[in-house]
């Protein structure tokens, strides 16, 4: 069994990250610059996002280098975060890492959704909101069936996190959605 932990800018916890890294766990960046840039700059179309891609990439590289400096970790395998804005745009954050030049500049070996990362898994499941709990299969059933290797994606907020953290994040999402729906100046 091997685990990796990816931290967003908004969820990074220096103490936890250091403890995990010292224990030999892979710790890296859970990035979301594309969605964040689109929301901050009121972009509503993939074309507008593509036009801004050089700025988005620069922000991503800057954030990644800052995390590497702060934690002294290679962070050369990164993981894209999914946001409501990505679903609206039909454009995942990982679009950033499709650029080989960016990968070279940023020192990225792979992104967790790259084919070479996903292909070895016989099955890949993700936790989901109750009452479903699992998307793409139940890991307990897959283990009993002898499915191996198995990739399992989990999110702390779906299992046991501090209620105020979840409430705060939900409040931000609602505010963003209302601004998006009723705000002026979206491109």
PLM features: residue spans?
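Terminal accessory/targeting
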Residues: 1-4, 11-23, 34, 39-187
């Amino acid at each position: 069994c091997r685990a990796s932990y990816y931290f967003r800018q908004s969820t990074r916890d220096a103490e936890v990250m250091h403890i995990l890294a010292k224990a030999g766990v892979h710790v890296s960046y859970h990035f979301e610059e594309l969605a964040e840039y689109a929301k901050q700059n009121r972009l509503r179309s993939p074309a507008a996002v593509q036009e801004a891609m050089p700025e988005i990439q620069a922000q991503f590289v800057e954030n990644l280098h800052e995390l590497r400096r702060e934690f002294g970790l290679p962070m050369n395998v990164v993981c894209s975060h999914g946001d409501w804005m990505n679903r609206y745009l039909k454009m995942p954050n990982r679009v950033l890492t499709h650029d080989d030049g960016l990968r070279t500049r940023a020192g990225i070996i792979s992104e967790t959704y790259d084919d070479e990362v996903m292909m070895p898994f016989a099955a890949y499941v993700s936790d989901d909101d109750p009452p479903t709990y699992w998307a793409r299969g139940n890991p307990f059933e897959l283990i009993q069936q002898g499915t191996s290797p198995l990739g399992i994606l989990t999110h702390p907020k779906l299992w046991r996190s501090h209620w105020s953290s979840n409430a705060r994040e939900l409040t931000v999402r609602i505010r963003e959605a209302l601004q998006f729906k009723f705000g002026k100046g979206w491109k």
